[in-house]
Amino acid sequence: MQASLPKTIVGLGGKFAYPNLAEETPDTLTTLYEFDGFNLVWDSAMGIDNGSYERDHGIAFIGNNATLILNRGGWEVIEERRSKNKVAKPLVKPTDRGLDKHSQNFISAIRANDPSFVNCSIQE
């Protein structure tokens, strides 16, 4: 797409799923970004029973020929019924959540007594 900044942005949302929670961020939001030659729609919602595509969290990229769905459980491509393009459809499930690698890296930094060994910053 090679787009820079959108020409216009319009958003609509509010606190509809959990209106009594003490949070300021909307739990429901739809935003339309207008670029030269295409539009992009961002939908965000909390409180939908099992969520879109039978997943309780994640993100979907909807295109002309297929939809790419990603979450912490993996990814899946759902092909449009009328698409002439054949696309891969694996659901890739990770064997771990990366916690083992983070723990090993942290222990290595402690053993070396060198904080620069840590691959990510330590937040207080």
In which residue ranges do the predicted regions lie?
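Contiguous beta-strand/loop segments that form the cofactor/metal-binding neighborhood of enzyme cores
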Residues: 1-124
